[in-house]
Amino acid sequence: MEKTQIQQLVKQFPLVQELIELNPVTWFNPRATTLQAGLPFVGLDAADVADAEQRLARFAPYLSAAFPETRAANGVIESEVVALPAMQTALDQRYGLSLAGRLLLKKDSHLPISGSIKARGGIYEVLAHAEKLALAAGLLQLTDDYAKLFSAEFREFFGGYRIAVGSTGNLGMSIGIISARLGFSVSVHMSADAREWKKQKLRDNGVNVVEYEQDYGVAVEQGRLQAASDPRCFFIDDENSQTLFLGYAVAGGRLRRQFAESGVQVDAQHPLFVYLPCGVGGGPGGVAFGLKLAFGDHVHCIFAEPTHSPCMLLGVHTGLHDGIAVQDLGIDNQTAADGLAVGRASGFVGRAMERLLSGFYTLSDREMFALLGLLDSHEHIQLEPSALAGMPGPWRVTADTEWLAAQGLNEQQMKNATHLVWATGGGMVPEAEMAKYLANARQSI
């Protein structure tokens, strides 16, 4: 971008200057509207999410057979919700502001198979593709017991097909592990930010890892090119995939059931705020869509990004979406939050969800590490840095009394509020790597 173009953009959107200066910002979205008004722009609806849920139910016997760690939950890939009372007290002190509602954590960080939120969308898209191939070949009926897929016959069949994906780490882990287990030949194109241990875990699972010196966008593009020249290769497109998006969206109805079972109320008098770390946008976008379908206008979804990679905030705030990258403004896209190291947001997610997202904020790597250390010491929960991005959210919301008033949210409603931080990854981080994170955290607190 030319200097004059940047100056023009800053003049039109002063917040962009704050992003360029890498200052942590909070922005509430003036275009946010009701579910009824915003839903038509998504291009998907509750029936699509129900279809995804049914597909996952069909695959539960397969997952149970192929991944023993899912057996206790009968082949359902789901995570628990836990309260964080000690962390809430610690952050009240850290931010000098008392949070009126209750702080909860959604532990997608500890999802089975791949230990991140990507176990939702990534695994779902591979299963949907496998089902399509097996149905077309006449090897499978929708009424079959899908446990039959866990067999030499099906591994041989899927072995004739290839899957490719570009990833900063966690999506590649999910897609690589499930694809290889089914029998596919799978290549994961990894950006420079990807952690070494994630690459090694993939190799240990029989996955072909292709490494790049460049960022996420280049890895995705190369994966796309590989698939384009090979009719038997299926490219999973993190930037544009509706199937991935729907895999994530299933989380909404499941959370509603979890809340019903544990007595967490969500209605006009008991608002729900959900804080989602955002990279390219597919995971948080899909989850937010599912949450809006499940809780309607009583849920407020807020995206969190690193100060060095604020791609979705930039795209939605300016309305340019994937027409602008943080690098165009001289922002380097270098962050320890490897899952969030994305310079250009998904245009599909930005345009689909811009009317259903309440707000966005950024935070520094140093803050993520400090929060990582605090969560470990106060709650004995260990996450990777990017999974902490949602943690300051409740205090950012509480601090903006003007926005709360504009939403018609009063003191009593905020006392009744539930603040859910979506922990996106960290359950499979090796001990040595976690020790490094915690050492960094001690310096950051």
From Swiss-Prot:
Listed Pfam families: PALP
Keyword hit for Lyase: yes
Keywords on record: Lyase, Pyridoxal phosphate
Gene3D superfamilies listed in its UniProt record: 3.40.50.1100
Disulfide bonds: none
Cofactor annotation: pyridoxal 5'-phosphate
Positions bearing N6-(pyridoxal phosphate)lysine: K118
InterPro entries assigned: D_Ser_am_lyase (IPR011780), Ser/Thr_Dehydratase (IPR050147), Ser/Thr_deHydtase_PyrdxlP-BS (IPR000634), TrpB-like_PALP (IPR001926), TrpB-like_PALP_sf (IPR036052)
PROSITE patterns: DEHYDRATASE_SER_THR (PS00165)
Reactions the enzyme catalyzes: D-serine = pyruvate + NH4(+)
EC assignment: 4.3.1.18
Listed GO MF terms: D-serine ammonia-lyase activity; hydro-lyase activity; pyridoxal phosphate binding
Family: Belongs to the serine/threonine dehydratase family. DsdA subfamily.
Subunit and interaction comment: Monomer.
The name this protein goes by in its record: D-serine dehydratase
Organism, scientific name: Serratia proteamaculans (strain 568)
Gene: dsdA
